[in-house]
Amino acid sequence: MTTKVEHAYIEKVQGIQGGRPVIKGTRTPVKSIVIYHRMGFTPEEIQIKLPHLNLAQIYDALSYYYDFKDEIDLDIDTDSEEKIKQELNLSFL
């Protein structure tokens, strides 16, 4: 039996971060939390980097990530690819 998990601190709003998941009431995308986490930052260290967030918001973002890992990973990979393309185009100017 599967139970649907609610994420009290996560929302998707058209016009904010392209409708991607963000911390509710902020413009901070879930993927930003995930990137810090991948870099080895603990939730407490992430809070120091992003002091406008509380630990519950950060933990919920990580929980959301693990519930929707493929979606967030694709978003991060797509962003990385776009940045690389932009840097390559700029290097030829």
Specify the residue positions occupied by each region the protein language model found.
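A generic structural signal for short, solvent-exposed coil/turn residues
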Residues: T2-K4, G15, Q47
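Anion-recognition interface
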Residues: G25
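Long, charge-rich, low-complexity alpha-helical segments
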Residues: P29-L93
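Intrinsically disordered, low-complexity and often Lys/Arg-enriched segments
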Residues: M1-V5, S91-L93
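Short, Lys/Arg-enriched N-terminal segment that forms or immediately precedes the first helix
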Residues: H7-V22
